[in-house]
């Protein structure tokens, strides 16, 4: 799994034009997760150099992602730099202004 994450999110290796990755772990059944949708949508619009991924924690196929990132509650956000290194983690709802501080 580590190699897969590095290949997908280390933009110095794969040449993709992103500076950051935001992985939003959540579920469509979770009220705080649904509140995060508008925050993530705002990041998508205002920060084109941020690669955004949503991982549905309710889907069994995503269990390996939850294990790898040690996700124990949702919503949870993981921000990685362009080398794929985790630089910020947050558990629960986070307002847009607070989240975008990590994309400087």
What are the functions of these language-model segments?
Residues 1-12:
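N-terminal "domain-start" segment that seeds a small globular fold
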Residues 13-28:
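Short active-site neighborhood of thiol/selenol oxidoreductases, capturing the structured segment around
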Residues 25, 48-62:
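Thiol-based oxidoreductase modules, predominantly thioredoxin-like and allied folds used
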Residues 30-34, 77:
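The canonical Cys-X-X-Cys-His
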Residues 33-46:
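Typically the conserved alpha-helix immediately C-terminal to a functionally engaged Cys/Sec
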Residues 37-40, 66, 96, 100:
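Extracytoplasmic/secreted envelope proteins and their assembly/folding machinery
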Residues 59-73:
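Short Fe-S-cluster ligation motifs
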Residues 73, 78-104:
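Non-catalytic, surface beta->alpha helical segment in thiol-disulfide oxidoreductase systems
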């Amino acid at each position: 799994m580590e190699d897969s994450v590095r290949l997908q999110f280390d933009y110095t290796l794969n040449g993709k034009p992103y500076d950051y990755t935001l992985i939003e772990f959540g579920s469509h059944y979770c009220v705080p997760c649904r509140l995060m949708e508008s925050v993530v949508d705002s990041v998508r619009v205002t920060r084109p150099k941020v690669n955004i991924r949503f991982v549905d924690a309710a889907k069994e196929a995503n269990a390996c992602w939850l294990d790898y990132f040690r996700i124990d509650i949702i919503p949870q956000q993981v921000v990685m730099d362009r080398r794929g290194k985790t630089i910020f983690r947050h558990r629960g709802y986070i307002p847009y202004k607070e989240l975008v501080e990590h994309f400087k």
